[in-house]
Amino acid sequence: MDKIILMIFILLSAFGLVMIYSASSYFSLTSVGNSEYFLIRQFAFVVAGIAIAIGIANNGKKFFFNERLLQIVYVILILLLLFVFTQSGIKGAKSWINLRIFNLQPSEFAKVILIWASAFYYQKFKDSKDWKQLYMYPMGMMALVSILVLMQPDFGTVMITVLMMWLLALTTGFSKRAIKYSGVAFVIGYLFTYLPISIIQYLPFKAYQVGRFLSFHNPWDDTSGVGYQSIQGFLALARGGLTGTGLSSSIQKTGFLPEAHTDFILAIVGEELGFIIVWLVLVVLFFLILYIFWKAQFCKSLFSRYLCLGVGIFLLVQSGVNIGALLGLAPITGVPLPFLSYGGSSFIVSSIAIGMVLFALKYDKEYQEEIKNKIRMNEFILEEDEEKEISQEEQLEEVTVQLIDEEEDEHEEITGG
């Protein structure tokens, strides 16, 4: 098991607990009468998440290569995505299932299930010359999930899922033309967010989604409306400066910054601990992502390689979208920051992703050892064959020498006689 990945995962999770408690204490005290409410819940998710990650790392071989199980899990996911439409909406979206203990968000689990499916089918059809066969299953599964999630509506999850699957597909060996067209499509998609307000308001989006687009363009146009959250995030970062105001001394979390303990947790880190700590946190987070990419390039097993690449891309895209929204570089879509933001479904999914990487690296090590053993066995067989050939040659030489000696003896007897 890769200790570096596991240690960084635990370190970020522990830091996340500290910041969730600090960012949520005021809100939880005023809403439920207990300042530790969100801390206790997140602590339970962290303990469960670490256990799940280690469990997957040690037992993944039992189910990751089972295609029937993959299909069953995917069907269950689709049923859950359909079931959410029977639930009451939260903040304008029907994305959660109320389980009494916590709210389950099936669309979050779609990310790791699609990574699993991609790694499985890209490895299965690695020798296929038909690109349709190679991409049919992963892209078809993604398309159905994206349609259902978009209907909730949850544009942020769809954006991350599509971008993640597109980038993972590029690693399978797209042609230069396909890469060029994909790049053009990405640029067009990003420029789409800069459409004039007069056009955006007529597109089939909910009112709050249109508001997020508008605040992304210029939050200062409506400081008390759609631009309010972005501006409060900016103020939190500005107030913290380089060194921060001190842990638990945030003003923005006291009712000014919405979702301070979830989507905008990094703003509170900046306000209380300063830009230097924000920078260190991001360095650790992106070191983890780059380390996963680095380990992926040495994987001999294609399944392990695609699993690592998929998780690395997922963490990179999700982190980028969250940070981009905070800095005003992307629309606010309610995307949490991996390992740091409050949220049961989000943290468990991130834990599953880490478990998948730990398993992939462990399995690849076994896979490489198996290859080495086969090479040694083949070399041993070749050596045995060579020894047999040598022994046969020696026997032939001995017989030849004996025949020569016998002939010489006979010759001596004849001449002597």
Enumerate the language-model features and the residues they cover.
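Hydrophobic, glycine- and aromatic-enriched re-entrant/interface helices and adjoining loop segments
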Residues: 182-277
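Hydrophobic alpha-helical transmembrane segments
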Residues: 44-52, 272-292
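N-terminal membrane topogenic signal
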Residues: 1-9
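Alpha-helical transmembrane segments of multi-pass membrane proteins
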Residues: 11-25
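Hydrophobic alpha-helical segments of polytopic membrane proteins
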Residues: 69-70, 74-78, 135-148, 155-201
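Short, highly charged, low-complexity non-transmembrane loops/tails of multi-pass membrane proteins
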Residues: 212, 367-405
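Loop-to-helix entry and N-terminal half of a specific, functionally important transmembrane alpha helix
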Residues: 294-333
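Membrane-helix boundary/helix-loop-helix interface segments in multi-pass membrane proteins
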Residues: 3-4, 26-152, 323, 327-333, ...
